[in-house]
Regions:
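Helix-loop boundary and gating motifs at the non-cytosolic
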Residues: 2-52, 207-242, 246
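Transmembrane alpha-helix termini and helix-breaking/packing motifs in multi-pass membrane transporters
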Residues: 31-36, 147-164, 348-364
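Helix-to-loop junctions at the C-terminal end of transmembrane segments
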Residues: 58-71, 259-272, 357
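Structural signature of the two symmetry-related core transmembrane helices
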Residues: 74-88, 170, 275-290, 370
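Helix-loop junctions at membrane interfaces in 12-TM secondary transporters
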Residues: 91-102, 292-303
Length: 388
């Protein structure tokens, strides 16, 4: 089986458009919430947390359910469409509590399709090619995450307001739904066996979930780094210029991610998935340290490099490592659990980080994130799970 096949390419291209959609929105959303709607940083954490929590619940169900049906694709298409609908509501929003509803709806759609998409991707290639397939997908995914913020940066710099950006973001959102529906196919797989579906997931998988959960609690949303980017540039720039610099940080971190995604997948196939993932956890810890002590353009660039380097590596290698630990017929359930744990951890992370950021200070929030993520990297390195 060729690893670069119709499904790998189709899922990748569709997610390129999907990421252009929501990353265009997310590049400016924390700035829209704080500068546009006048909300505190705590509101950013609450919005991120509610979105991640609602997504986690849906992920657990969709992964479990997709192992019991033969038509995963239809559910995934519905998930893509729901995300576009939720983000589209932002064009009419006037208060930050309304953002909570729109963000939750959008991320429920993401939760519906994410485990299914990952299971479809894993079911489309042989195990020896999982790293390359997930790395290629993440590279296209991150390319979309580069296009979206670039468009947001250009629109914001040319005098357009936040709502104009939300309107433009609907275009790639609609494109992603159409592309996924037309190009991808449900991979052939064994008929679901009710007995095998009741067998517990293997011990190696649960061994991985411990560092995944610890990292997730420390790995707060990139929105906080965007806020921090604006803060560390405020002494040198006007507020408007600092906001543009923060969007530039978001764009730069996605550019780094696009560059490292595929090489990281190749490296994971040849060096080992667990060591590469552990290293990515530690890189995020280093990014938090830079956010605490750094100032000016150098800190902004270094923070973009570190945050950008770890993000796609974590996403792709967690997926390929999970695929190597679980039998194909249980992949939907496994990805549901993986994404569910990540979602619950992200909920805790965003709410705690937002509260600490608002009531204690950014340094404490970033310091706690660094400690937790470094600990997760050490645990994963010492207790590496064995593939099935």
């Amino acid at each position: 089986m060729r690893w670069l096949n119709r499904n790998v390419l189709g899922i990748g291209i569709a997610d390129l458009a999907a990421d252009a959609n929501y990353e265009m929105v997310f590049a400016v959303l924390p700035l829209f919430i704080t500068a546009g709607l006048g909300a505190p940083a705590f509101a950013v954490g609450l919005i991120e947390g509610v979105g991640d929590g609602s997504s986690a619940v849906v992920k657990l169900w969709s992964g479990w359910y997709s192992d019991r049906i033969a038509w995963r694709k239809r559910l995934a298409v519905g998930g893509y469409g729901t995300t576009v609908l939720g983000l589209g509501l932002l064009v009419a929003i006037t208060t930050w509590p309304q953002v909570v509803v729109a963000r939750a709806l959008a991320w429920m759609g993401r939760g519906l399709r994410q485990p299914i998409r990952s299971a479809m991707l894993a079911g489309s290639v042989e195990k020896k090619d999982l790293g390359k397939a997930f790395g290629f997908h993440e590279a296209l995914d991150t390319a979309g995450a580069l296009i979206g913020p670039a468009a947001a940066f250009l629109l914001l710099s040319s005098g357009h307001d936040f709502r104009a950006i939300f309107w433009v973001a609907l275009i790639p959102g609609a494109v992603c739904v159409v592309l996924f529906a037309l190009i991808t196919r449900d991979p052939r797989r064994e008929r679901p066996d009710p007995v095998s579906l009741r067998v517990p997931l293997p011990a190696g998988f649960w061994r991985l979930m411990l560092p995944v959960g610890v990292f997730g609690i420390g790995n707060f949303a990139t929105a906080f780094f965007t806020l921090r980017a604006a803060q560390i540039m405020q002494p040198e720039l006007t507020q408007a210029a600092a906001l543009s610099a923060a969007v530039g940080f978001y764009l730069a971190h996605n550019a780094v991610g696009a560059a490292v995604s595929f090489p990281a997948g190749w490296l994971a196939d040849h060096v080992g998935k667990a060591p590469v993932l552990a290293a990515a956890y530690v890189v995020f810890a280093a990014a938090c340290v830079v956010g605490v002590v750094g100032h000016g353009w150098f800190a902004l660039g270094l923070m973009a490099l570190l945050v950008g380097a770890q993000n796609p590596v974590v996403s792709s290698v967690e997926g390929s490592l999970t695929s190597s630990l679980v039998e194909p017929r249980r992949l939907g359930t496994a990805f549901g659990v993986l994404n569910g744990i990540n979602g619950v951890a992200d909920l805790a992370s965003s709410v705690v980080a937002g509260a600490l950021w608002t009531f204690v200070g950014p340094a404490v929030a970033l310091g706690l994130g660094s400690l937790l993520c470094a600990s997760a990297g050490v645990v994963l390195w010492v207790r590496q799970p064995k593939p099935v």
